[in-house]
Amino acid sequence: MRTHDDTWDIKTSVGTTAVMVAAARAAETDRPDALIRDPYAKLLVTNTGAGALWEAMLDPSMVAKVEAIDAEAAAMVEHMRSYQAVRTNFFDTYFNNAVIDGIRQFVILASGLDSRAYRLDWPTGTTVYEIDQPKVLAYKSTTLAEHGVTPTADRREVPIDLRQDWPPALRSAGFDPSARTAWLAEGLLMYLPATAQDGLFTEIGGLSAVGSRIAVETSPLHGDEWREQMQLRFRRVSDALGFEQAVDVQELIYHDENRAVVADWLNRHGWRATAQSAPDEMRRVGRWGDGVPMADDKDAFAEFVTAHRL
């Protein structure tokens, strides 16, 4: 269970979810029709020691193996892989558009194993700030450096928990609140309580010059019964495949029904925001699959919100 002051490294708790996401990016990169290319994802996954389960997600035959056990669970695995690719592509495009607009200051909140500071083609003079737990940041930078990988921008680490007083740490790293900024909150909100989500956006607003922008992945809502069913199904699949399920992701998420609707909150607090549902974006790029549970429940899926500071 989560606590208000829990911490982690790349092999424990919330840290392992970054490995899961990187595994999905690695699997996508190996596809002939890949939406995104992340040449460092597989390296970051295989060096974590986070467990055989996440490394198994790199196996191109994994969906077929799961399907032999549980067809609906296999549809979920395929959906999650495609979702991560679509999400990554959406936010890559967001960053690229910010660059075209002349923004040169970027902040990735809870950056995990995000490799954009290394794999995107940044213009000279671009600074990318990454905020996350100290051990998570250290694992990524050390692993990539040991393999001769260097950032393509001025990458600056801000090793602090976002539940703490992080703005002073960001400023100390060189952040300029008078400059336009492009913020990214991807794969973050579900790991924050509702009040912490509001507090995070309030802090971001106070640091954002006019013309700044933000992109956010929202936190979908799932009922207790659905979560319990998914936990049982994936535990059964893991057992059948011989994998130890060291971390139950559902136990890491805050399921707050009173969480603010992100686009609405931003529109009320000095931003002009729009939202794109994840299923609509997946259909737009040809990655929505049949057989996804709860396909008709819009609240069961995230939104991708983008906003400009007024």
From Swiss-Prot:
A Pfam family hit: LCM
Binding positions for S-adenosyl-L-methionine per the UniProt entry: D132, D161, L162
Keyword Transmembrane in record: no
UniProt-recorded Gene Ontology molecular function terms: methyltransferase activity
Coiled-coil parts of chain: none
The keyword S-adenosyl-L-methionine is annotated on this UniProt entry: yes
Domain of life: Bacteria
A GO BP entry: methylation
InterPro entries, alphabetized: Ppm1/Ppm2/Tcmp, SAM-dependent_MTases_sf, SAM_mthyl_Trfase_ML2640-like
EC number: 2.1.1.-
Keyword list, A-Z: Methyltransferase, S-adenosyl-L-methionine, Transferase
Family: Belongs to the UPF0677 family.
Biological role stated in the UniProt entry: Exhibits S-adenosyl-L-methionine-dependent methyltransferase activity.
PANTHER family: S-ADENOSYL-L-METHIONINE-DEPENDENT METHYLTRANSFERASE YKTD-RELATED, S-ADENOSYL-L-METHIONINE-DEPENDENT METHYLTRANSFERASES SUPERFAMILY PROTEIN
Name of the protein: Putative S-adenosyl-L-methionine-dependent methyltransferase ML2640
Lineage: Bacteria, Bacillati, Actinomycetota, Actinomycetes, Mycobacteriales
